[in-house]
């Protein structure tokens, strides 16, 4: 299992991860404070193939 988190607003990165086989597992709202504003974070994971 490989997991990652990415800012929800970073659509290009999310598409790239999806193309690499990652799937969205959840969203944490207002989790990261960046430039004075709270941002949503998407958690993604890729599981080993059996």
Give the label of every model feature segment.
Residues 8-26:
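Conserved active-site alpha-helix within GNAT-family acetyltransferase domains
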Residues 3-6, 23-39, 43:
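Conserved catalytic-core motifs of GNAT/GCN5-like acyltransferases
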Residues 47-50:
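Acetyl-CoA-dependent GNAT
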């Amino acid at each position: 299992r490989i997991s990652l988190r990415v800012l929800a607003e970073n659509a290009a990165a999310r598409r790239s991860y999806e193309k690499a086989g990652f799937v969205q597992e959840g969203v944490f709202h207002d989790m990261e404070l960046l430039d004075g504003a709270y941002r949503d974070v998407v958690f993604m994971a890729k599981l080993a193939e059996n």
